[in-house]
Amino acid sequence: MLTERQSMILKYIIDDYSKTGVPIGSKALAEQLPIHVSSATIRNEMAVLSHQNFIEKLHTSSGRVPSNQGYRYYIDNLAKPAKLDTKRLEYISEMLDGSFQQIDEIVRQSADILSHLTDYTALTFSPELTTENTIKHLQLVNLGLNRMMVVIVMGNEQVESQSFLVTNQYIDSQLSLATNLLNQQLVGKTAREVKQVFQSKILTELHTYLPDTKQFVRAIQAILSKIDDDHYFISGQMNMFEQNGKQDFSKIKSLYSMFNNDNGIDALLEKSSKPISVKIGAEFDNDWLKDYSIITGSYDLGNHGIGRIALIGPMRMSYPNMLGVVDAFRHELKNRISGYYRSYDQ
């Protein structure tokens, strides 16, 4: 455990490095510290911090920079979320105050807002139930002109639809009977269980009311694929490369591959019970992320699940500022999505 003075020196080293990206020496630190301490005393304390691997020396400078261990100590013990100013809070509220037809529209917009606020790469995730999501209701809709649409409402109020072509003409009573049959067989089942149901005798019975069964099944399969997918959105990918200077092509290729891989994204984010968590450099499995940090925030929507947001930026980011943005943003997003669900439930 560090002493109060050692903690203060470490904090000022990290705060200065986040602003300048330049190693700092004892003389410059002496001018910044709020207490009167000689350069010699600071050098001694920095030697202790260096010996304990909280700071390290670069080959190109006599000054010191934070180490991974130093950043971890700083994040866990010294960095406090900065309060967001009124202007930025109003910007978030205004941008989330649009007319949205689906949750995913809000979540997609959120990624753009968060990236714009920070100039970092932002990820936003649709709320996910802690238990498996099941079908709440299914509806067949006749669109006319040989087109039909199937609409599925999930337990978390996620709504997905898919239109399909039909070769037969249908009257309302046929669609009503087909819809009733489908709801009897599918309500309460997960996407995985629904796939198994369609391998059973239900298709024979459904064909009685809906001869275009093959087209319907293809539409259902398209919806189930969307439901099974993690619903997340990314904005500002190029910021990752601009923030940390020149990057080699293989690293860029690896990062883009990660962004387009659900498993890669899941492995990237910190698994934590805390509302806000931070994962840094050496804690990533991939060497090409050693210069980055990820701040993840979650928001609890009760019966509607838990949503997540994340920021990816350079490890020398201003943690108080970014923690403050993530904290304020997750609260605003929770309020906006809660309002959507309230209007939907009415």
Curated annotation (Swiss-Prot):
Disulfide topology: none
Keywords noted in UniProt: Repressor, Stress response, Transcription, Transcription regulation
Residues making up the signal peptide according to the UniProt record: none
InterPro entries membership: GAF-like_dom_sf, HrcA, HrcA_C, WH-like_DNA-bd_sf, WH_DNA-bd_sf, WHTH_HrcA_DNA-bd, WHTH_transcript_rep_HrcA_IDD
Pfam families assigned to the protein according to its UniProt record, in alphabetical order: HrcA (PF01628), HrcA_DNA-bdg (PF03444)
Gene Ontology biological process terms from the UniProt entry: negative regulation of DNA-templated transcription
SUPFAM superfamilies: GAF domain-like (SSF55781), Winged helix' DNA-binding domain (SSF46785)
Molecular function terms, GO-annotated: DNA binding
Annotated function: Negative regulator of class I heat shock genes (grpE-dnaK-dnaJ and groELS operons). Prevents heat-shock induction of these operons.
PANTHER family in the record: HEAT-INDUCIBLE TRANSCRIPTION REPRESSOR HRCA (PTHR34824:SF1)
Family membership noted in the UniProt record: Belongs to the HrcA family.
Protein name: Heat-inducible transcription repressor HrcA
Organism annotation: Fructilactobacillus sanfranciscensis (Lactobacillus sanfranciscensis)
Lineage, highest ranks first: Bacteria, Bacillati, Bacillota, Bacilli, Lactobacillales
